């Protein structure tokens, strides 16, 4: 039996946190952070971590679970998510995953089998190969590749369900057997509804710049100095945007204003990469609540139909 999961994605500063709270209240949900940096304690400002006041009485998971010296891999993310989703569902609540690292979310939803280094290398390489093939040749050509290898499986998978087509190709390569002859457990694990938030680029970049200014006012530089004093970029948590840009400033190599501009530039670039990832690799239904707040009704309708 598949577990329904709502996933809210999109770049920073477009309202994902507020939407997640609204959905959790309306549909009896609990929230899992999908951000690989929000797992770290004492990194609240630079990670745009939800505040206790914003949480209200909605339970949140995968926030403040590690020290900055501890590593957090995609395998750790999947393990934690699966446990949290199970706990939420067992309490008759809907799991809601918010924001996050695109590859981590995709790995969870596409049902990677965890197996240490083998998982990290071979599975990722197979997946990336077929993703690149699709980006270059299109969904139809991708589906045709599956049809050449396993026509029975291809007839059962719609062309537009490229995630499933890629999964089938990956399994065939991994096992050397037809996908249609195998019991693929990932197919039964999750039934995600992917909701994406975005807005026009000029507005998005303006909101990102403003958010960085607010972060500076509320203590981002002090947070970066905390990481710097512990080891900076040598720490698992020390390479995040919003922190690493200040290390040259602390070393006297650039000015504070230059560091702040680097944070803004890197944040904008990351937002662009996020959008490219989610659009190319995940089946997301997009909304712009910044310019069209009334679209919240369309989101509720989408959820009602999905439930």
From Swiss-Prot:
Example GO BP: tRNA modification
Residues that hold substrate according to the record: 12-17
E.C. numbers: 2.5.1.75
Co-factor(s): Mg(2+)
Catalytic activity: adenosine(37) in tRNA + dimethylallyl diphosphate = N(6)-dimethylallyladenosine(37) in tRNA + diphosphate
Highest taxon of the lineage: Bacteria
Region (Interaction with substrate tRNA): 35-38
Binding positions (ATP): 10-17
GO molecular-function terms, A-Z: ATP binding; tRNA dimethylallyltransferase activity
Residues the UniProt record annotates as site (Interaction with substrate tRNA): 101, 127
InterPro entries documented for this protein: Dimethylallyltransferase, IPT, P-loop_NTPase
Subunit details: Monomer.
Primary role: Catalyzes the transfer of a dimethylallyl group onto the adenine at position 37 in tRNAs that read codons beginning with uridine, leading to the formation of N6-(dimethylallyl)adenosine (i(6)A).
PANTHER family for this protein: TRNA DIMETHYLALLYLTRANSFERASE (PTHR11088:SF60)
Family: Belongs to the IPP transferase family.
UniProt cross-references to HAMAP family, sorted A to Z: IPP_trans
Name of protein: tRNA dimethylallyltransferase
Organism per entry: Ligilactobacillus salivarius (strain UCC118) (Lactobacillus salivarius)
Gene name in the database record: miaA
């Amino acid at each position: 039996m598949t577990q329904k999961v709502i996933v809210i994605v999109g770049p920073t500063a477009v309202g994902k946190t507020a939407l997640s709270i609204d959905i959790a209240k309306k549909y009896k949900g609990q929230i899992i952070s999908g951000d690989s940096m929000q797992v770290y304690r004492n990194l609240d400002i630079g990670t745009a971590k939800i505040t206790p006041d914003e949480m209200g009485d909605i339970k949140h998971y995968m926030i403040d679970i590690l020290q900055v010296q501890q590593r957090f891999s995609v395998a750790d993310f999947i393990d934690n998510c699966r446990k949290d989703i199970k706990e939420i569902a067992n309490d008759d609540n809907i799991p809601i995953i918010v924001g996050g690292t695109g590859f981590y979310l995709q790995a969870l939803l596409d049902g990677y089998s965890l197996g240490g280094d083998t998982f990290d290398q071979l599975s990722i390489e197979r997946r990336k190969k077929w993703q690149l093939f699709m980006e270059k040749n299109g969904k139809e050509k991708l589906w045709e590749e599956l049809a050449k290898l396993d026509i029975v499986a291809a007839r059962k998978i719609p062309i537009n369900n490229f995630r499933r087509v890629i999964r089938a190709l990956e399994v065939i390569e991994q096992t050397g057997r037809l996908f249609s002859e195998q019991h693929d457990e990932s197919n039964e694990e999750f039934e995600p509804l992917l909701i994406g938030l975005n807005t026009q680029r000029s507005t998005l970049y303006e909101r990102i710049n403003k958010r960085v200014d607010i972060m500076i006012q509320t203590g981002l530089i002090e947070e970066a100095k905390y990481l710097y004093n512990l080891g900076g970029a040598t720490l698992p948590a020390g390479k995040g945007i919003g922190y690493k840009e200040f290390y040259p400033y602390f070393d006297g190599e650039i000015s504070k204003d230059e560091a702040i501009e680097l944070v803004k530039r890197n944040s904008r670039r990351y937002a662009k990469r996020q959008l490219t990832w989610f659009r190319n690799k995940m089946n997301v239904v997009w909304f712009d609540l910044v310019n069209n707040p009334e679209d919240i009704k369309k989101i509720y309708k989408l959820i009602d139909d999905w439930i």
